[in-house]
């Protein structure tokens, strides 16, 4: 793990001009050689670099200049900027290129049909091929020259070397052997290879944009204009003119523009893009609204508390952008292959030429075979295999309400075989409720009195048990008297004076002098008992329990169906933890654990070879979250828990954890498929080209299709159901 210093600064840089993974490797290598760069990673699919550097030794401008000198355009990525911008230079260049390709294509089809009359005269072929090589193919040459200057080779080197070689050979035959030129010029190959490769890059860029549409969808959730109250009048203004604290109105069909609190009105809001919850949520005065939510019914007037990047929506976009720009460990394999891929292909091409010439004594066939090898080899498919799937998978996760911190966290999640869950707030609601009440048979006071007296004392405290008792009394519409606070004994209870009643104690049974009756012993095993006494005479007791969340059982069943071991680790009484575990069908449950105990138990599981995911809620879960291979925090968790976690669950539901595991596994499977396709394509394609089974034109078309097929396979993740 990278050790950051106070001087460390992390920036995201948008890069233009990369044509394959070799380009990304080259930039990464150059940046990491600089002494002030602590870490640099370049994502070819997202066309983005993430750089951590010492801000006392270098500036952002210097980092950008380094990339410029490497031969690529670059700029600091702005907040909410999409990773890949439209490239308007591709369409017109592609149109002209394919207009030139048409006569060559007609001639090729004629030759297949046995007619040579449709072929252009050699001099016309030379003229059109020259336009392509000297003008339309300039981006390939520029990329190749820049790559060679940087000490590396990329796809541009292969394409430009192959097409230029066959173009120069054909020109030589035309001008020095004009009488035999018609049968020995291959201008159509140099033209059509550039055409197919350019078309493939265009389609590849479009497909990459589709793989990133989760980010663009989030960006589109923000309304362009909003209605605000100024000088007692409602006016419509641009969102960027809104100030924090202003009153905003959102009617049915409009989106919320800022995170805020409802001042008046009520309605229903669809927050599915933000939390993964498919059903609209009712909103009333005093409730919170989130930027990007759609008002499906009613009208809401709210006060803006956070705007832009400070909103939950802004956090989501920044988190998704950072994660999509990161690299998964499995990408290292592709990086290693692509770093040596082009040099190896160049050697294979030269060997192909030499062996073919030795065996056939035919320079033309030797040249065609060598060029076919250069053209069919495709490092792009390998380079796209991992990041394309990661970007789609991360977008899918965000739509399901799961934020992965980076690609590495998603990959590690795919390997999880054991899930450790905290009890309170994770499996249970974390809200204590009075489940039973006891009073002696000779009770002097009524049940309502018991509630009133207990609430009068507990109203002065601020812990979950106190809140549960006060809320229960208020729900019964009881008038709660005012007690004079006397003293609190930590871990025991509270004592207060109530006029005309006496000294009231509320707390543990022994603190109030209560010996538990036999009929309460069973409840004690699964509940917290709070006794009440007046003048040291017990008058009753409450049993408070934390109820299971409605979806906890379903979530545990889904985990077990995926052959994942489930373990509960809690600081609560062992009997209470066992009771919850029995309800959920969980065999392993540990109670009375301190935060350090939880971390040690997780380490023991890891030592046994398990890949452990921990799900927790609260500061006391932070050590355990840090100890696990992968950690998930609930969105309402403490800041410490969220900072420690590998991912965040937006719905506060274990079911979202199951969704995260499913998406991560599907993404890893997709990556392996992509790598297999890319490797098989090159393993089969290069020998076929070397032995003359593929012409340069077919090889160029196959090369273009290889990258597109990998991207299309990655896009299948969008349709995965769970």
From Swiss-Prot:
BP GO annotations: copper ion homeostasis
Top-rank taxon, per record: Bacteria
Compartments, record wording: Cell membrane
Coiled-coil intervals, chain numbering: none
Binding residues annotated for a metal cation, in chain numbering: 20, 23
The protein's Enzyme Commission number: 7.2.2.-
Residues given in the record as Mg(2+) binding sites: 617, 621
Catalytic activity: ATP + H2O = ADP + phosphate + H(+)
Active site location: 422 (4-aspartylphosphate intermediate)
Membrane-related topology note: Multi-pass membrane protein
Main subcellular localisation: membrane
Record's GO cellular component terms: membrane; plasma membrane
EC class: translocase
Ranges where the HMA domain occurs: 9-75
UniProt entry keywords in alphabetical sequence: ATP-binding, Cell membrane, Magnesium, Membrane, Metal-binding, Nucleotide-binding, Phosphoprotein, Translocase, Transmembrane, Transmembrane helix
Family stated for the protein in its record: Belongs to the cation transport ATPase (P-type) (TC 3.A.3) family. Type IB subfamily.
Name by which UniProt lists this protein: Probable cation-transporting ATPase HI_0290
Species this protein is from: Haemophilus influenzae (strain ATCC 51907 / DSM 11121 / KW20 / Rd)
């Amino acid at each position: 793990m990278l050790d950051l210093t106070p001087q460390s600064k992390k920036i995201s840089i948008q890069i233009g001009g990369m044509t394959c993974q070799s380009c990304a490797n080259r930039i990464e290598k150059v940046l990491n050689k600089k002494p002030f760069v602590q870490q640099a990673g370049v994502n070819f699919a997202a066309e983005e670099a993430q750089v951590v550097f010492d801000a006392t030794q270098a500036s952002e401008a210097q980092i950008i200049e380094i990339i410029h000198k490497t031969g690529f355009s670059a700029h600091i990525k702005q907040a909410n900027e999409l990773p890949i911008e439209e490239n308007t230079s591709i369409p017109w260049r592609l149109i002209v290129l394919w207009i030139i390709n048409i006569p060559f294509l007609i001639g090729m089809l004629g030759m297949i049909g046995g007619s040579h009359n449709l072929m252009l005269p050699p001099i016309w072929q030379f003229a059109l091929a020259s336009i392509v090589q000297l003008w339309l193919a300039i981006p390939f040459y520029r990329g190749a020259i820049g790559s060679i200057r940087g000490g590396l080779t990329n796809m541009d080197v292969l394409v430009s070397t192959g097409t230029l070689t066959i173009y120069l050979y054909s020109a030589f035959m035309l001008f020095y052997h004009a009488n035999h030129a018609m049968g020995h010029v291959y201008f159509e190959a140099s033209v059509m290879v550039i055409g197919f490769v350019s078309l493939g890059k265009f389609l590849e860029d479009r497909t990459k944009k589709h793989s990133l549409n989760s980010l663009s969808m989030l960006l589109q959730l923000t309304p362009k204009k909003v209605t605000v109250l100024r000088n007692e009048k409602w006016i419509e203004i641009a969102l960027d003119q809104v100030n924090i604290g202003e009153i905003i109105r959102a009617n049915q069909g409009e989106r919320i523009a800022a995170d805020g609190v409802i001042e008046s009105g009520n309605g229903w809001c669809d927050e599915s893009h933000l939390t993964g919850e498919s059903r609209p949520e009712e909103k009333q005065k005093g409730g919170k609204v989130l930027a990007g939510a759609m008002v499906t019914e009613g009208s809401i007037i709210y006060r803006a508390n956070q705007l832009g990047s400070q909103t939950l929506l802004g956090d989501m976009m920044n988190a998704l952008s950072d994660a999509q720009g990161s690299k998964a460990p499995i990408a290292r394999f592709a990086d290693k292959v692509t770093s040596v891929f082009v040099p190896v292909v160049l050697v294979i091409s030269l060997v192909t030429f030499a062996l073919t010439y030795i065996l056939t004594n035919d320079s033309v066939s030797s040249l065609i075979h060598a060029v076919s090898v250069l053209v069919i080899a495709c490092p792009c498919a390998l380079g796209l295999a991992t990041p394309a799937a990661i970007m789609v998978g991360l977008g899918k996760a965000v739509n399901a309400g799961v934020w992965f911190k980076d690609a590495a966290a998603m990959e590690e999640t795919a390997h999880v075989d054991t899930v450790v869950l905290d009890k309170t707030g994770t499996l249970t609601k974390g809200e204590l409720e009075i489940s039973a009440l006891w009073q002696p048979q000779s009770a002097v006071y009524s049940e309502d009195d018991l509630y009133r007296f207990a609430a009068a004392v507990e109203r002065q405290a601020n812990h979950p048990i106190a809140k549960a008792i006060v809320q229960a009394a208020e729900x019964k519409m009881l008038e709660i008297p005012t007690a004079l606070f006397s003293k609190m004994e930590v871990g025991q209870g509270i004592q207060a004076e109530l006029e005309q009643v006496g000294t009231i104690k509320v707390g543990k049974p022994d603190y109030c002098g209560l010996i538990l009756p036999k009929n309460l012993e069973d409840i004690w095993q699964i509940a917290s008992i709070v006794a009440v006494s007046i003048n040291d005479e017990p008058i009753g007791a409450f049993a408070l329990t934390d109820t299971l969340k409605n979806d906890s059982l379903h979530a545990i069943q889904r985990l077990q169906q995926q052959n994942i071991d489930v373990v509960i680790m809690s600081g609560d009484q062992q009997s209470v933890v066992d009771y919850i575990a029995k309800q959920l069908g969980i065999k392993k449950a540990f109670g009375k654990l301190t935060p350090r105990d939880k971390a040690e138990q997780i380490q023991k599981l890891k030592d046994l070879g398990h890949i452990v995911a921990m799900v927790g809620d609260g500061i006391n879960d932070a050590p355990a979250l840090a100890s696990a291979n992968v950690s998930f925090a609930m969105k309402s968790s403490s800041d410490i828990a969220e900072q420690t976690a590998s991912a965040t669950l937006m719905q506060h539901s274990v079911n979202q954890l199951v969704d995260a595991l499913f998406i991560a596994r599907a993404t890893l499977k997709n990556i392996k498929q992509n790598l297999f396709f890319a490797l098989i394509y090159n393993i089969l394609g290069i020998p076929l080209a070397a032995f003359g089974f593929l012409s340069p034109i077919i090889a160029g078309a196959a090369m273009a299709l290889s990258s597109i097929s990998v991207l299309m396979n990655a896009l299948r993740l969008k349709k995965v159901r769970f």
